[in-house]
Amino acid sequence: MPATPNNVPEPSRTDPALIRNFCIIAHIDHGKSTLADRMLQLTGVVDQRQMRAQYLDRMDIERERGITIKSQAVRLPWAPTQEPGNTHILNMIDTPGHVDFTYEVSRSLAACEGTVLLVDAAQGIEAQTLANLYLAMENDLKIIPVLNKIDLPAAQPEKFSEELANLIGCDPEDVLKVSAKTGLGVEALLDKVVAEVPAPVGVADAPARAMIFDSVYDSYRGVVTYVRVIDGQLNKRERIRMMSTGATHELLEIGVSSPEMKPADGLGVGEVGYLITGVKDVRQSKVGDTITTLNKGATEALGGYKDPKPMVFSGLYPLDGSDYPELRDALDKLQLNDAALVYEPETSAALGFGFRVGFLGLLHLDVIRERLEREFGLDLIATAPNVVYRVLMEDGSEHTVTNPSEFPEGKISEVYEPVVRATILAPSEFIGSIMELCQTRRGTLLGMDYLSEDRVEIRYTLPLAEIVFDFFDQLKSKTRGYASLDYEPTGEQASSLVKVDILLHGDKVDAFSAITHKDAAYAYGVRLVAKLRELIPRQAFEVPIQAAIGSRVIARETIRAIRKDVLAKCYGGDISRKRKLLEKQKEGKKRMKMVGSVEVPQEAFIAVLSSDDSGGSAKGKK
């Protein structure tokens, strides 16, 4: 039964023994946000009239795509069915489920003592659930296995509870069966959270230490920082210090979100809440950082803090060059809310002024691009995504390349590219086609495990550059949509990579340059010149389109010249007269060819850069 507001313990005065911090781990579309909605309703923190689906997903893109991008934290009062008078406080931390946001997930997990592992009873375990489960196990969290959507006709609760039990090492009977849509079994789940998740452990009179697990930008109040207090206490109007940057701020407001913000006097050990310091830049409150009080503060930060590193780079250019200032302002505003987004201005001879933007992965790229187009009304061209290469020259110098046009000329001794460890889960009948796909993408098989007789987990080492194009789309189409993919960076390897330039009429077009593996360079060149031949309109003179590695041309197509019929006014008559006219035309064409320049229409850029087979598309990565 929902706890009535009169017996709910106040923040800062809650006994840590009554607090339970937990999160929900689930693959996309397995019903995590719906389960969160049911919990909000059952505990009575959201009025029935204000309830809407996916209550915690505030961004339009989150609601439409059904994905959670930013973590949320909600304080839920709950009195277990066995002891109705004893109200506990459950802090539910809603985590992103996507592989691009793994660091955010790991920080959210570090703020919890337990986790609900939610699996769709019709689909079973997917790769991203598995990746987050391993993260939870590394953090020694208590895992509560739950099967969702048991009201579906296609549900197979017995089969999947067996699979879950094998994975975690519990009995199939321990797997709870719920339907987040109808609310069936959710009360039992909340009771189990109270019974099984350990209470937070911390020293109440030690110097205050709190971990930031998320920060969001509010246009009225500045940055709102979500924290979990580990030791000590934070009080209103205290001065605090960020331990990674040493910056100090005053706590203007402190409180809990339930799920709307409720100010309080302070936060004690084990509590999860928010702080407002009036800071205007999210980069000053970094996810994973430790907060302490300015006087008598802690000397040792909590472990696990990392700066998010961009993995994938893409150039973003406005279709209309005059929108450049708007694009800069839009990126500035998005960066307030997304500390992992990095960008710097760049110019392209072909596309004009734009920005080189760094992302955590393909979904991150897609979401940012969609937000720029939707929230700021910008029309953009995005160049094909690139990864970061490290190039060692024979003279010992080293270059970091995030853009093909920066690839150094001259004698190169080694090129290093980032590699990832990919985990693919799929029905066992597709093993052959998955292995074939990974082999063509220069993958190395690490191992293979059967989770049950018809589901298999395949592990590969793959170059990140091979994944950022259309790997996910290909994987889905080869497995009829059943495979799921997860990857994590594992360092770098030396590869024989070359830069392929596209020359139009002898001039390089920087927007079409690409860094590819030596073996794939010829195919890339042939495909691109053939495509450009179709897209570039015919000129009054002949235009060669060439693909070249350095000074060696590897592929060529020619756009034939348009010819005017100069013989139209000659009726019969002398052949030498006709020859004279044709020679004169030929001379003119030759002169034109020497001074002429080729205009590449905007449509050709868009078609080439967003085409599936040249790899500019990240659409399938949802």
UniProtKB/Swiss-Prot annotation:
Residues annotated as binding GTP: D29, H30, G31, K32, S33, T34, N148, K149, I150, D151
EC top class, as a word: hydrolase
Membrane topology category: Peripheral membrane protein
Residue intervals of the tr-type G domain: 17-201
SUPFAM superfamilies xref list: EF-G C-terminal domain-like (SSF54980), P-loop containing nucleoside triphosphate hydrolases (SSF52540), Translation proteins (SSF50447)
GO molecular function: GTP binding; GTPase activity; ribosome binding; translation elongation factor activity
A Pfam family reported for this protein in Swiss-Prot or TrEMBL: LepA_C
GO biological process terms, semicolon-separated: positive regulation of translation
Keywords, sorted A to Z: Cell membrane, GTP-binding, Hydrolase, Membrane, Nucleotide-binding, Protein biosynthesis
Reaction catalysis annotation: GTP + H2O = GDP + phosphate + H(+)
Top-level taxon of origin: Bacteria
Any one cellular-component term (Gene Ontology): plasma membrane
Entries under PROSITE patterns matching the protein: G_TR_1, G_TR_2
InterPro entries, sorted: EF-4, EFG_III/V, EFG_V-like, EFTu-like_2, G_TR_CS, LepA_C_sf, LepA_CTD, LepA_IV
Protein localization: Cell membrane
EC identifiers of the protein: 3.6.5.n1
HAMAP family per the UniProt record, alphabetical: LepA
Similarity comment: family membership: Belongs to the TRAFAC class translation factor GTPase superfamily. Classic translation factor GTPase family. LepA subfamily.
Function: Required for accurate and efficient protein synthesis under certain stress conditions. May act as a fidelity factor of the translation reaction, by catalyzing a one-codon backward translocation of tRNAs on improperly translocated ribosomes. Back-translocation proceeds from a post-translocation (POST) complex to a pre-translocation (PRE) complex, thus giving elongation factor G a second chance to translocate the tRNAs correctly. Binds to ribosomes in a GTP-dependent manner.
The name this protein goes by in its record: Elongation factor 4
Taxonomic source organism: Streptomyces avermitilis (strain ATCC 31267 / DSM 46492 / JCM 5070 / NBRC 14893 / NCIMB 12804 / NRRL 8165 / MA-4680)
Gene: lepA
